[in-house]
């Protein structure tokens, strides 16, 4: 986070957040879990980050990545109004197949796909706001969120946002 955000975290919550450069200064194989909650879609150098994660994870460590899924029902419904496209802040847009490919390129494998159930409602509400849909939009957002989640019940790869549990393949160690 930027300096102002780090100061607010310290002042308001007594949390010390480090500049992103510190990621590259951590000892190798020092983390059992690295978690990114709606972060990866914002990074400028995806390859450098993936390499850093590989070097920081311990043997059998896990990388947990949560990102929006542009192949979800709500993304298909809202099309250009889908709030999780969030341009220009989202530099990347992921789907289960693109995450699988990213992992394969980095000698990693997705172990699990888990839906983020509430994201479908939040993203649908924002999408309706972008459409200036008014009160009816709030009602429609609820139903679109429900439909999106129903589809994710059958297939987690259809969720509005997905939590990926990722491990390195042995050859990467």
What are these regions (language model features)?
Residues 1-78, 93-105, 161-173:
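Conserved SAM-binding loop
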Residues 78-87, 125-133:
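Short glycine/proline- and charge-enriched loop/turn segments
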Residues 96-114, 140-143:
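A SAM-dependent methyltransferase catalytic signature shared across enzymes that methylate proteins
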């Amino acid at each position: 986070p930027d300096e102002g955000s780090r100061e607010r975290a310290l002042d308001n919550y007594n949390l010390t957040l480090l500049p992103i450069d510190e990621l590259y200064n951590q000892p190798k194989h020092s983390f059992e879990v690295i978690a990114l909650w709606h972060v990866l879609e914002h990074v400028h150098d995806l390859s450098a980050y993936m390499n850093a994660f590989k070097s920081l994870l311990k043997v059998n460590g896990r990388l947990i990545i949560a990102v929006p899924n542009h192949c979800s029902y709500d993304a298909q419904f809202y099309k250009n109004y889908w709030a999780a496209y969030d341009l220009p802040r989202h530099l990347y847009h992921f789907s289960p197949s693109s995450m699988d490919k990213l992992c394969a390129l980095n000698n990693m494998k997705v172990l699990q796909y888990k839906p983020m159930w509430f994201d479908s409602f939040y993203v649908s509400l924002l999408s309706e706001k972008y459409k200036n849909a008014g009160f009816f939009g709030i009602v429609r957002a609820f139903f679109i969120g429900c439909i999106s989640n129903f589809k994710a019940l059958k297939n987690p790869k259809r969720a509005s946002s997905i939590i990926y549990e990722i491990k390195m393949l042995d050859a990467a160690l």
